[in-house]
Structure formats: structure tokens, C-alpha cells
């Protein structure tokens, strides 16, 4: 009653109902669906009123109204200058009849609120796009280039609206609009001249404007103190330019939705590397700090070998060693050692010799202290790249899952989408037939994005049309482990990671090959690993030949008919240069109501903040299990709050249940790395892999990151660390237990807005 008063508006009453209902979620997680229904009622009222239809509608009425709502939405969106007028030329009556209004009931509160806050098309903050119209608009946009537009749009709609698969955020934002920028990731190489440097920064601004996430390779730019021949002066190095990149990302907001997001990469032999690793520190000269930009190390195998062998490492300026940037594997090692020899003879006089282990320690201490630079591995990305015949992978992207060639002439682009694994389990195992069906449609949708995409920069269009890379990923991995009653920290989970990714990989590659039969192979196909019958599983051999057996520990088992698929590709070709990448999926996992990507559950109960305020999120499978055991009550809720969403310290919960519902910090990093290693053998790009460590130490970090390298991982993402002090609790004077952290973040270094695992707003790779 306290929310009701004389003069209260209907909108305030509706808002109060939602807020009241969502407070009940912590006691009974199914209230998330009840809250979503109340919110749905409000959304319908807002949208239908704007479209001039009626002020509210029940569920059965809405199922009747959806065809008309679609028609009016298209008319209004085109009139407002937002939607592509070509949508109106499709058979709207047929599409309207295909809408499944009952699927409105599948949303959790968080999923629907996320769509309302961030995705639905609006006019002066009034949303007039209804949930199923949203999915149909995206599907129509993706079908514009098809011959059978309506048939394909309905096929795409059924995949999205059933939550079997979800396109990435830029695709959901912009498909079917006047500016159809549907791609998630852009990768660029910055040349070593002033014109090229500022051209790259301008490209960043233009690409970021339309919600793309950026990865920049800065290795070619000469180091601090090296000579500039044109002026006979000394270079200020990479860092001052990175400060400009940082401030540009802040200044350019993504279509009014959020500030731009960028990650800068530097190779470990660059003379500026010691300053580069400190860019995110909160102390020191602020003119040489980038507080809003992500950074990543691009580490060659030779450096890791030198660390292991306790040897020295030489830093060069790229203006003296220009070819190192384009070399990898044994060719890099040979040339690097030749340059080292030239320092002995005096041919190269600008260099710095350091202890490899000392630099490694500094890299690890900065990753712990600031969360950056991330650790990513150059040689494995190149040696296992299908496209090594036409270029070099010089960096990854904003979320470290994309590994595509870049050069001064080519900006790499990748379009993402993720299969919801929880919808592909039947009778306790993977539903192979459904996985094949889902992936066939998903690959087609991703390939369509390339042709209908809006390209803000010509070099991006050139490379995307030439190579046609896409990135199919997965989400809901930990939810599936719950369904299978399998703890993440187990050999069974590692084996499931292997078999599930093998199946996704097999059908993704097959679908791209089948699409090539229909549409033709991508233009740079000849000479690729694909054309030689070398699939991702086969490229491990190339890595082993370069690195040596003693520095590689990778499982190479397989279960599917890969020989048959090799023959199919030789006959049909393949449509896309790269087919798979596992993105973080933070936002789209919220929409579909599953665990993010390959992430372990962060906490079993926590308070989430978004544009609509704070609300509790609980682990629904865990609550169901505890209910079955008669253990779910108010005391359990308070215990979970007290222990920050962890079940480990609650004595009345059986041990096997504690193992099953262990949170991220309770799972040894070994298990995450082993599962990632098994997946990586099947993936032609990479995976966004966050690592979690409880009570970190230099030794633990050293073991963890060296293990990641030895297991053949291409990239790692954030390091999440939690000190011993964060688990200490005290009872407040009132006797109430401490509330769980409102952000569900560990006590670690402040992180940027980009791609935080508990930030539902990251638009780049999700």
C-alpha cells in the first residue's frame, strides 16, 4: 500500500507491481516468470497504444493482435525513418500469421527487461516494438537477400523466438533498420606513420559509432626513443597514441547506447612492452595511462620457451626489425635470433636485453593488479589459422575470441551468434539431429549478415566480402552440466566440453560447406587449410611441429566422421574462411535465460543492477534441487546471502550437491583450462575464456597461464581474482546477515565497462 497514494498514475502502479513481484524472486525463483508477465502487460500496453490499436491485451488477445501489430509497426518504423522500407515489400500477412504469441511466456524477468531497456525500437523513449515483432523484424532483416524471403524469415524467426539460437547484439539492434551494422568485431593493424596512425583512430571512431567492438594491433609503431628519419627526432613511442585511442573510445558513444569499446594489442618483443603492461595502473603519470581501454599481450612461443628455460629476452623497436611482425613459429624464432646476433655485432644498437622471467612476472602482476593486459598467444593463432596463405593474425579482438588476418589494407570483421546448448539435450545427451538443424539455419543467418551489413569503413567491407568469416559459438554450457548432474570440476565435464564442441564444429563446418555448394566458396579459398583437407583438429599437428612435443599437451581424440567431411569440403568447398568463435554472450544469455557462454556460474544468488534498478537473481536448477531435498527455506536464502551465493559453507547441503553447484572461484582453474583445451581443438578461431583464482599468488598465476599455453589455448580473457579477505563476514549489529554484493563482482581491480561478465550492457561481442 505504501506505493499507492492519491493521484498515483497508472504507470506508477504498473511499475510498482513489477518492482514488488521481482522482490519475491529470491524466495521463489519462478516469480521471475510471473514478474515477466506483469512487465509484458506493461510493454503491450505501451506498444499497442502507440500503434493506435488498443490500450491493453490479454495473452489470447495478443496472439490474435500480433499480425496487425507487425503491419502497423513496420509502417510506423518506416515513417519514423528507422526501418528499411524494403521490409514492407515482403508478404506481411504471411509473416504475421507465423508469429507465435505464446512464446512471450518463455521470458524470464531479466530477459524481457533487458530487451525492453536496450533493444526494442522506440520513439522519444516510447517502445512500440513488441517482443515477437522484435524477433520477426530481425529475421526479416536477415532474409532480405534471400530468394524465398518469407520462407527464410519464418525459419529464422522460429530459431530466434524459441531461444534455440541467438544472434549477437549488433545484429539484434540493427537488422532491418536503415543502418544495418550487424557485425560484432573489428580488428585493425596500425601502420608506423602519422597519417596511418590517425587514420586508424578515425576508423575506430567510425566503427565504434555503430556498436562494433575493436581490436587494434599496435606492434608496427616504432618504440620510445627510436629515430624518426623524416625529422631526425626521437619517437615518443606507442603510449601517447594509445591515450588518444582511449579518449576517442570514451568520446564516441555507440549510436547513443554506450561508449565505444576497444582493446589494444602489443607483441612481447616491442621495446615499449614494459610501459604498455602498466597502462591500466592507477598510479604514475596520468598522461601515460589508459583507464578506459582494454590492453592485451600478443605473446610469441619463443618468449614462453625463454621463460621456461630461464633465458634472456631482447626488446626491439619495429623500425629496426620490421619483418618480425609478420613472422610466427620457427620462422619467427630464426629471424629473432638473427636480430639478437646483430645486437652483438653492433648492426642494431637500439635494443634492451632483459630477463624473460622478470618480464613474465611483471605481466602476471599487472594482470592481477589491473586486470590487464590479457595474455594471448600469437603463434598458435597463426599456425592453426585456415587463412595463413593470405596473411597474418596480428591480434585478437575486444573479447579475445576472434583470430583473423589484418593488414594496412584489410580490417577484419566478424559476425557472431550462439547456439543455446540447453535446448539441445534430449534424454540426458546431446540431440544430434536438432543440433544439425539449428546450426544449418544459424550458419545461413551469419553468412547473410556479410552481404546485408552496413560497412562504415571500406577496408572492412573489402576483407569481409573476400573471406566471409563468421563466428558460431555456444552458451548455457554450465546449465547443461546441471541438467546432466555433472560438476564443472570433473573429467566428465571436460569430456562433455570435448564432445559437445566436436558436434557443433562438425555440423558448423558441414553447413558452411553445404552453403558453398549453393552459393560458392569464399574467394580466397584456394590455398587455405580447408582446401588442403586440413581441418581444425588436423592443424594441431602444425603447432606441434613448430613448438615441439615438450611444449604441447593436447588431447587429439575424435568420434565423428571427419574423413567423410574432409572429402565433402574437397568436393564442395566451404563458404566461410572461419566458422566458429565462442563469444562471452553476456547480454544474449540474459535474453534467453541461460548461463553465459562457457562460463561457470559466478554466484548462485546475487543482486543484479541494470537500467531498471536492482533485483535478485538465483540459480534456478540449484533451487529446484534444494526444494527436492526439502532444504529451500528463508534460512537457506540468508545463508546464501551470507556466503556470497556459495553453497560450500552451508553444512546441511550434501557434499555431492556442493560439488555440482560450486561457483566460479570454487572450481580450480585447471578444470576451466582443460575444458577450454578440449574445445579449442575443434574451433578455427578462439574462445572468450575468463579465468578465476581464489587467493592468488605469483606462483599460482605462473602455473595457470603456462598451463593455458601448454594446453594449446589461443587466448585468455579476464583474470578474476578473489583474496582471502573477501570471504570473511561479520554479523551486523541488528543480527541480520550481510547482504550479498550488489554488483556480484569480486573485490579486484576496477574494470572497464567493456564486456564485464556481470555487466548486462556490453554490446560488442555479446
Mark where each language-model region is.
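Acidic, low-complexity intrinsically disordered tails
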Residues: 729-766
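Internal maturation/activation junctions in enzymes
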Residues: 438-461, 487-585, 655-658, 687-688, ...
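Catalytic alpha/beta core of large soluble enzyme barrels
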Residues: 88-114, 402-405, 446-451, 555-559, ...
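Often metal-dependent polyanion-binding catalytic scaffolds in large enzymes
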Residues: 1-128
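Gly/Pro-rich turn-and-neighbor structural signature
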Residues: 127-195, 333-365, 370-375, 500-567
Amino acid at each position: 500500500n505504501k506505493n499507492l497514494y492519491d493521484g498515483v498514475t497508472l504507470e506508477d502502479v504498473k511499475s510498482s507491481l513489477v518492482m514488488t513481484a521481482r522482490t519475491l524472486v529470491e524466495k521463489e525463483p519462478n516469480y521471475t516468470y510471473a514478474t515477466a508477465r506483469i512487465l509484458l502487460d506493461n510493454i503491450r500496453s505501451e506498444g499497442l497504444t502507440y500503434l493506435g490499436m488498443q490500450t491493453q491485451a490479454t495473452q489470447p488477445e495478443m496472439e490474435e493482435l500480433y499480425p496487425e501489430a507487425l503491419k502497423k509497426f513496420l509502417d510506423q518504423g518506416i515513417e519514423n525513418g528507422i526501418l528499411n522500407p524494403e521490409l514492407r515489400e515482403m508478404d506481411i500477412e504471411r509473416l504475421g500469421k507465423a508469429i507465435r504469441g505464446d512464446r512471450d511466456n518463455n521470458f524470464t524477468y531479466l530477459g524481457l527487461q533487458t530487451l525492453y531497456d536496450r533493444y526494442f525500437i522506440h520513439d522519444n523513449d516510447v517502445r512500440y516494438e513488441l517482443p515477437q515483432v522484435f524477433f520477426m523484424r530481425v529475421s526479416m532483416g536477415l532474409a532480405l537477400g534471400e530468394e524465398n524471403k518469407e520462407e527464410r524469415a519464418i525459419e529464422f524467426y522460429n530459431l530466434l523466438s524459441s531461444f534455440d539460437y541467438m544472434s549477437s547484439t549488433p545484429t539484434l539492434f540493427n537488422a532491418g533498420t536503415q543502418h544495418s551494422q550487424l557485425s560484432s568485431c573489428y580488428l585493425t593493424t596500425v601502420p608506423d606513420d602519422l597519417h596511418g596512425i590517425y587514420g586508424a583512430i578515425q576508423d575506430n571512431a567510425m566503427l565504434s559509432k555503430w556498436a562494433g567492438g575493436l581490436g587494434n594491433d599496435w606492434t608496427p609503431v616504432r618504440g620510445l626513443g627510436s629515430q624518426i628519419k623524416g625529422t631526425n627526432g626521437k619517437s615518443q613511442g606507442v603510449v601517447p597514441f594509445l591515450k588518444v585511442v582511449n579518449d576517442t573510445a570514451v568520446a564516441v558513444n555507440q549510436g547513443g547506447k554506450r561508449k565505444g569499446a576497444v582493446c589494444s594489442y602489443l607483441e612481447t618483443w616491442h621495446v615499449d612492452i614494459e610501459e604498455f603492461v602498466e597502462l591500466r595502473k592507477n598510479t604514475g603519470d596520468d598522461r601515460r595511462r589508459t583507464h578506459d581501454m582494454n590492453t592485451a599481450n600478443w605473446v610469441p612461443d619463443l618468449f614462453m620457451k625463454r621463460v621456461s628455460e630461464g633465458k634472456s629476452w631482447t626488446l626491439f623497436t619495429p623500425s629496426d626489425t620490421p619483418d618480425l611482425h609478420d613472422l610466427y613459429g620457427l620462422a619467427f624464432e630464426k629471424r629473432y635470433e638473427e636480430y639478437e646476433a646483430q645486437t652483438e655485432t653492433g648492426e642494431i644498437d637500439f635494443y634492451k636485453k632483459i630477463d624473460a622471467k622478470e618480464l613474465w612476472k611483471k605481466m602476471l602482476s599487472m594482470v592481477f593488479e589491473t586486470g590487464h593486459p590479457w595474455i594471448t598467444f600469437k603463434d598458435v593463432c597463426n599456425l592453426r589459422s585456415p587463412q595463413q596463405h593470405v596473411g597474418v593474425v596480428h591480434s585478437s579482438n575486444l573479447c579475445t575470441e576472434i583470430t583473423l588476418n589484418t593488414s594496412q589494407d584489410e580490417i577484419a570483421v566478424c559476425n557472431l551468434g550462439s547456439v543455446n546448448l540447453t535446448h539441445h539435450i534430449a534424454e540426458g545427451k546431446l540431440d544430434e539431429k536438432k543440433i544439425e538443424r539449428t546450426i544449418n539455419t544459424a550458419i545461413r543467418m551469419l553468412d547473410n549478415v556479410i552481404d546485408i551489413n552496413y560497412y562504415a569503413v571500406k577496408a572492412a567491407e573489402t576483407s569481409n566480402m573476400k573471406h566471409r568469416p563468421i563466428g558460431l559459438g555456444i552458451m548455457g554450457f554450465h546449465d547443461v552440466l546441471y541438467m546432466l548432474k555433472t560438476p564443472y570440476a570433473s573429467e566428465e565435464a571436460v569430456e562433455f566440453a570435448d564432445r559437445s564442441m566436436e558436434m557443433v564444429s562438425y555440423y558448423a563446418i558441414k553447413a558452411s560447406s553445404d552453403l558453398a555448394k549453393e552459393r560458392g566458396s569464399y574467394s580466397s579459398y584456394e590455398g587455405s587449410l580447408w582446401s588442403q583437407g586440413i581441418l581444425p583438429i588436423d592443424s594441431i599437428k602444425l603447432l606441434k611441429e613448430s613448438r615441439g612435443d615438450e611444449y604441447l599437451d593436447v588431447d587429439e581424440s575424435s568420434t565423428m566422421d571427419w574423413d567423410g567431411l574432409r572429402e565433402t569440403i574437397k568436393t564442395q568447398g566451404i563458404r566461410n574462411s572461419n566458422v566458429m568463435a565462442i563469444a562471452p554472450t553476456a547480454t544474449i544469455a540474459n535474453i534467453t535465460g541461460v548461463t553465459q557462454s562457457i562460463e561457470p556460474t559466478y554466484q548462485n544468488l546475487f543482486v543484479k543492477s541494470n537500467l531498471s534498478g536492482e533485483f535478485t537473481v538465483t540459480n534456478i536448477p540449484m533451487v529446484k534441487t534444494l526444494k527436492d531435498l526439502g532444504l529451500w527455506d528463508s534460512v537457506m536464502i540468508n545463508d546464501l546471502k551470507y556466503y556470497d551465493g556459495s553453497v560450500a559453507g552451508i553444512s546441511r547441503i550434501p557434499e555431492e550437491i556442493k560439488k555440482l553447484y560450486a561457483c566460479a572461484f570454487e572450481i580450480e582453474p585447471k578444470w576451466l583450462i582443460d575444458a577450454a583445451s578440449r574445445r579449442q581443438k575443434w574451433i578455427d578461431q578462439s574462445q572468450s575464456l575468463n579465468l578465476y583464482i581464489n587467493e592468488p599468488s605469483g606462483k599460482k598465476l605462473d602455473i595457470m597461464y603456462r598451463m593455458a599455453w601448454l594446453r594449446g589455448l589461443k587466448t585468455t580473457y579476464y583474470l578474476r581474482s578473489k583474496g582471502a579477505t573477501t570471504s570473511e563476514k561479520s554479523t551486523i549489529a541488528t543480527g541480520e546477515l550481510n547482504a550479498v554484493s550488489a554488483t556480484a563482482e569480486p573485490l579486484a581491480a576496477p574494470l572497464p565497462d567493456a564486456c564485464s561478465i556481470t555487466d548486462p550492457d556490453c554490446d560488442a561481442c555479446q
